[in-house]
Amino acid sequence: MSNFVICINNDNNPASLILGKVYRKLPDVEAEAHDMFRIIDEDKSEPDGYLYPSSMFAPVELPEAAERALLAADA
């Protein structure tokens, strides 16, 4: 499963999520069991991310160089 997702619906969270933007999805088995994703959003005040419905995102497979760049930007 991809570590990155793209926002396809930000209707309820336009300040926290940008439509069409790629976000890092943090591992959270319990959240995913409830169809939720733990996401590092635009707020970035919560290092553990926030929970959002998985229906707001689509998984994205990125080239390795792009993944490295995005992970480095989060560090």
Task: Identify the function of each model-found stretch.
Residues 4-6, 10-56:
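Basic/aromatic-rich interaction segments and small domains that mediate binding to polyanionic partners
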